[in-house]
């Protein structure tokens, strides 16, 4: 009798646990379906998550970097013409060139989607990209390594070009399986650990991955505020109406120069790094 009683008690306990688990599963399924259909709730939860990430990111300081060399680097921004006193048009907008302090120990170059295009079906893009990697990206990487600037590789969807050699000191981001906000935070934490506060961007495509990926300029905009686009080390998959003159790349370069940061060139970066330290 006692054994049967204990078995009944155990069975009831097991049934209660099973029922509780079933309720939790049903509740989870209901919430999942509800969130998929309710955009306002999704937006609210996403904003809470983003605020939490920003709060955490701002709570820690960048590590100090000792004995770092500071030079002057020429950068470019764009100023839109909005003169209320005289007649002006959009063509009156102008580039602004200035020299800024550049601390190479606090800088990193992030290379977005430097693809292996050996299987690229568009022959013209494949040829342009091969030339771009050999004549722009490889020299930029060599320049960075010569001056001990951190090189970060961020490939998405395709392997890295066979022309780009990965060295032990390089960082290769492989976090595509994380939620977007976590990818941004992951990069941000890597940079903080190394005392890096300036990101130089290069790679593909100026108006897509380089800009709007979680580790792109737009994705990192709330976590950092010092972005420099290496404008002759970026390219875009152009449209048939824009290929001549690389209009997509150039227009989006202007957009970045207006709203998100500045740009420079490989040559300007080389001159800055090769010059004596600024007083």
Where are the model-predicted features located?
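Active-site-adjacent betaalpha module
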Residues: 32-108, 127, 138-139, 146-147, ...
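Acidic/histidine-rich, surface-exposed loop or edge segments in extracytoplasmic proteins
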Residues: 107-125
């Amino acid at each position: 009798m006692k054994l049967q009683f204990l078995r009944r008690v155990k069975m009831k306990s097991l049934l209660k646990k099973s029922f509780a688990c079933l309720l939790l599963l049903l509740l989870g399924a209901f919430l999942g379906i509800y969130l998929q259909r309710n955009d306002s709730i999704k937006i609210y939860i996403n904003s809470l998550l983003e605020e939490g990430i920003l709060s955490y990111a701002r709570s820690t300081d960048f590590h100090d970097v000792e004995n770092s060399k500071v030079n002057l680097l020429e950068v470019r921004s764009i100023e839109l013409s909005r003169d209320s006193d005289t007649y002006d048009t959009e063509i009156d907008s102008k580039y602004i060139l200035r020299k800024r302090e550049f601390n190479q120990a606090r800088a990193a170059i992030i290379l977005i989607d430097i693809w292996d295009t050996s299987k690229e079906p568009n022959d013209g893009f494949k040829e342009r990209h091969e030339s771009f990697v050999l004549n722009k990206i490889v020299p930029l990487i060599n320049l960075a390594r010569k001056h001990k600037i951190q090189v970060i590789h961020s490939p998405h969807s395709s392997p890295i070009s066979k022309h780009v050699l990965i060295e032990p000191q390089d960082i290769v981001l492989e976090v595509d399986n994380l939620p977007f906000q976590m990818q941004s935070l992951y990069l941000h934490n890597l940079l903080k650990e190394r005392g890096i506060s300036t990101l130089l961007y290069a790679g593909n495509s100026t108006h897509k991955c380089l800009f709007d990926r979680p580790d792109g300029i737009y994705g990192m905009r709330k976590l950092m505020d010092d972005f420099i686009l290496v404008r002759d080390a970026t390219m875009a998959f152009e449209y048939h109406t824009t290929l001549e003159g690389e209009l997509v790349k150039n227009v989006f370069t202007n957009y970045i120069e207006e709203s998100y940061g500045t740009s420079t060139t490989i040559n300007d970066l080389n001159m800055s790094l090769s010059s004596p330290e600024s007083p």
